[in-house]
């Protein structure tokens, strides 16, 4: 069995747009669950969710790319960018690179 080493972490969720703010909110016992604001929920029985509301995809992609790329991919790109910075990657070596991702929907 080969060893696996986690060298960088990137997070984006309803509690924070990066790992530091996410961990801080978790340690403070906060929840990201609140009333849904990103779309009309009047026809749905559930009115709450853990939405990511403060993320601006234009901070990582240009206008054309934002329109072409689904939101869950935008979020993945943001988290991946943070993980690569956290790992102090200088150059990309694809054969040494792996990604573990978790999402509620997407």
Where are these regions (language model features)?
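Conserved "HGTGT" condensation-loop signature of ketosynthase/thiolase-family condensing enzymes
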Residues: 1-106
């Amino acid at each position: 069995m080969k060893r696996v080493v986690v060298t960088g972490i990137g997070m984006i969720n309803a509690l924070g747009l990066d790992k530091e703010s996410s961990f801080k909110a978790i340690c403070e016992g906060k929840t990201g669950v609140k009333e849904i604001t990103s779309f009309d929920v009047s026809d749905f029985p559930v009115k709450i969710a853990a939405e990511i509301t403060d993320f601006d995809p234009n901070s990582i992609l240009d206008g054309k790319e934002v329109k072409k790329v689904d939101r869950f991919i935008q979020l993945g790109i943001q988290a991946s960018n943070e993980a690569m910075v956290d790992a102090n990657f200088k150059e990309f070596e694809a054969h040494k690179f792996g990604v573990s991702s978790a999402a509620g929907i997407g």
